[in-house]
């Protein structure tokens, strides 16, 4: 196995572990996949940097969507990243910003760039269409 193949395999294992930990609501395990925890949510402009902020993101997102889960669609490698397409699904059970909960489910196709420095995961940068989720949660057409 080449060095590049070894690096890609190790990175892929980290990303899969991270996504599985989120689905199992084992946020300490998901946090542990980072060398330095950082989330960048591009649709909202929010950045959560460091363990305390990333834990806050986990608490807030899972309070609104306690059954939030991801389903991997595809995974690709770049020089410094693993790029993942996935379905994110959940049911809103508590307020999300100004959106009151109506018990509605959402499903949104998303992309995440898991950014690496060498073998270390240092950032998850997530891209999605927030209007898709808002429409499903509010029932607007």
Predicted features and spans:
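C-terminal and inter-domain tail/linker signature
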Residues: 1-141
């Amino acid at each position: 196995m080449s060095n590049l193949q070894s690096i890609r395999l190790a990175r892929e294992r980290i990303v899969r572990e991270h996504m599985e930990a989120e689905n199992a609501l084992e946020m300490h395990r998901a946090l542990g996949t980072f060398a330095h925890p950082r989330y960048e949510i591009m649709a909202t402009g929010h950045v959560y940097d460091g363990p305390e902020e990333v834990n806050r993101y986990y608490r807030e997102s899972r309070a609104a969507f306690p059954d939030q889960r991801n389903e991997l669609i595809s995974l690709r490698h770049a020089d410094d990243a693993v790029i993942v397409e996935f379905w994110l699904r959940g049911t809103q059970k508590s307020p999300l910003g100004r959106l009151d909960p109506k018990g509605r489910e959402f499903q949104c196709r998303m992309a995440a760039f898991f950014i690496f420095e060498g073998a270390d995961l240092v950032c998850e940068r997530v891209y999605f269409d927030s209007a898709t989720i808002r429409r499903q949660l509010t029932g607007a057409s």
